[in-house]
From Swiss-Prot:
Its EC number is 2.1.3.15. One of its GO terms (molecular function) is ATP binding. Belongs to the AccA family. GO terms for cellular component: acetyl-CoA carboxylase complex. The gene is accA. This is Acetyl-coenzyme A carboxylase carboxyl transferase subunit alpha. Pfam families: ACCA. It comes from Cronobacter sakazakii (strain ATCC BAA-894) (Enterobacter sakazakii). InterPro entries: Acetyl_CoA_COase_a_su, ClpP/crotonase-like_dom_sf, COA_CT_C. The keyword tRNA-binding does not apply. One of its GO terms (biological process) is malonyl-CoA biosynthetic process. Keywords: ATP-binding, Cytoplasm, Fatty acid biosynthesis, Fatty acid metabolism, Lipid biosynthesis, Lipid metabolism, Nucleotide-binding, Transferase. Pathway: Lipid metabolism; malonyl-CoA biosynthesis; malonyl-CoA from acetyl-CoA: step 1/1. Residues 35-296 form the CoA carboxyltransferase C-terminal domain. Its main location: cytoplasm.
Length: 319
């Protein structure tokens, strides 16, 4: 897969282009007198070193760009790489099947779990079909239906958050977007099974929270979680979306800051260069964290689970 490089990664992109060019020449003419392999090896080491240097000092705006990277793994990628026997379930049993939310039963290390997550889509047709990962009310009602099913069958719930926000269209509002989100918040706080939520890309406002109330909340290293996008915040405060980098720094949208505020439990490290560079390694790290979280929650009784979740919610904010 050819990598897409972001603006701040251009020095890395230039090195990788040289590597690709030399590799292509080597394949075309194996009788060259110069030792291309040594030069390719040297450039690859230099690329890794440069990547480490750049990624050691990323700002919030750069992390926001990584969270939106078009090649970043989505929910169904992690389902394929970290789970077994996934059976997708569709529809809210009231209006429609919203493709921006995917869900179903799978096995995590042999254990049945319910998976629910946002799905953005990659190619143009799929992006449109999945509404760019922005759910309508029927998507959140589908998610709630699956959560209630998981509770009936005593299955843990695992959610993956990756959305710019709930769909703000007229039709969505007419069908009760705010009610659907609010109902999910209330019902998720009452579920009598373990709920583990992980932000894998963008955690955009109420659209993220509607599947984000859990006993454990994790974030991938280069994901974001916020009440509004940096561009939206900048447009309100400075009347210009060009101030988005400044807004991103001020908003505290990145995982280390949110962990410091005790809004999340864990930051899951990503492979060098981001999750899209090595989805398999990222999926394995995610799986390890999910299994550890389940082990922590399995020892709690249902009453203790609910009480712990209530105390968690009540602890949010400044005293």
């Amino acid at each position: 897969m050819s990598l897409n490089f972001l603006d701040f990664e251009q020095p890395i992109a230039e090195l990788e282009a040289k590597i690709d060019s030399l590799t292509a020449v080597s394949r075309q003419d194996e009788k060259l007198d110069i030792n291309i392999d040594e030069e390719v090896h040297r450039l690859r080491e230099k690329s890794v070193e440069l990547t480490r240097k750049i990624f050691a000092d990323l700002g919030a705006w750069q992390i926001a760009q990584l969270a939106r990277h078009p090649q970043r793994p989505y929910t169904l990628d992690y389902v394929r790489l970290a789970f077994d026997e996934f059976d997708e379930l569709a529809g809210d049993r009231a209006y429609a099947d919203d493709k921006a939310i995917v869900g179903g039963i799978a096995r995590l290390d042999g254990r049945p779990v319910m998976i629910i997550g946002h799905q953005k889509g990659r190619e143009t047709k799929e992006k449109i079909r999945r509404n760019f990962g922005m759910p309508a009310p029927e998507g959140y009602r589908k998610a709630l239906r699956l959560m209630e099913m998981a509770e009936r069958f005593n299955m843990p719930i695992i959610t993956f958050i990756d959305t710019p926000g709930a769909y703000p269209g007229v039709g969505a509002e007419e069908r009760g977007q705010s009610e659907a989100i609010a109902r999910n918040l209330r019902e998720m706080s009452r579920l009598k099974v373990p709920v583990i939520c992980t932000v894998i890309g963008e955690g955009g406002s109420g659209g993220a929270l509607a599947i984000g109330v859990g006993d454990k909340v994790n974030m991938l290293q280069y994901s974001t979680y916020s009440v509004i996008s940096p561009e939206g915040c900048a447009s309100i405060l400075w009347k210009s979306a060009d101030k988005a980098p400044l807004a991103a720094e001020a908003m505290g949208i990145i995982a280390p800051r949110l962990k410091e505020l005790k809004l999340i439990d864990s930051v899951i490290p990503e492979p060098l260069g981001g999750a899209h560079r090595n989805p398999e390694a990222m999926a394995q790290s995610l799986k390890t964290q999910l299994l550890a979280d389940l082990a922590d929650l399995d020892v709690l009784s249902k009453d203790d689970l609910l009480n712990r979740r209530y105390q968690r919610l009540m602890s949010y904010g400044y005293a």
